Amino acid sequence: MSEVKLILDDCLDAMREMEADSVDAIITDLPYGVTNCAWDAVIPFAPMWEAVKHVLKPRGAFVTTASQPFTSALVMSNLQWFRYEWVWEKSKGTGFLDANRRPLKAHENVVVFSDAATDYNPQMEKGTRHHRGQRAQSKPTTVYGKFTHSLEYSDERFPKSVMRFAVQERAEHPTQKPVALYAYLIRTYTNVGATVLDFTMGSGTTGVACVKTGRNFIGIELDEGYFDIATKRIAEARMQLPLLEVT
């Protein structure tokens, strides 16, 4: 069973007290600063990165959802660590009050940082099946030269940078993300038994996804109300473990 540790505290203070190089990945949902709510206040970048570098193992991934203009500000705060982004395409758009002036927004960013190449377990997708035995050979290019390795096609496809997950219908936090999205990210950037940190835990979605995928979890949350919600959700997920397939 996954080990779970939940901390009610300021995330920067709590992370400074943690052991150095103690987590395999940080997978979180940082506040974007798009509202005046206390829970949406942007964490100062300089002390945040200092804390991240303290707790994250070398080559560990720091993955967070984001949205413009916060995405650009976050990337520029540590361009050296920035690797790439995904786009999460939502099942529903937002911004109906401005629908006559701009398109409905139906996506968010998922931004990946690391000090070096990270663990990456591509979650293969099913595509159109090619005839077995069909092979391809590329033409010479000015960049790589002639590629002579023969490829045998199958129905497995590597993931593309656009992910499609339905939005959370019954949410206990205003920005609660779907468990399926975070389980996907956890499987992609960690292996079974790894330790994942979410230092802006909110209602505990990352923790629930860790329990379902067989990862250890450390969650930090400042708001006592959301901390209690997260504690309950993660406990319920652990009770369902005999019914879950850990991957």
What are these regions (language model features)?
Residues 1, 231-244:
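Short, conserved SAM-binding/catalytic segment
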Residues 1-219, 224-229:
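Core catalytic lobe of class I
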Residues 162, 242-247:
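Short acidic, low-complexity intrinsically disordered linear motifs used
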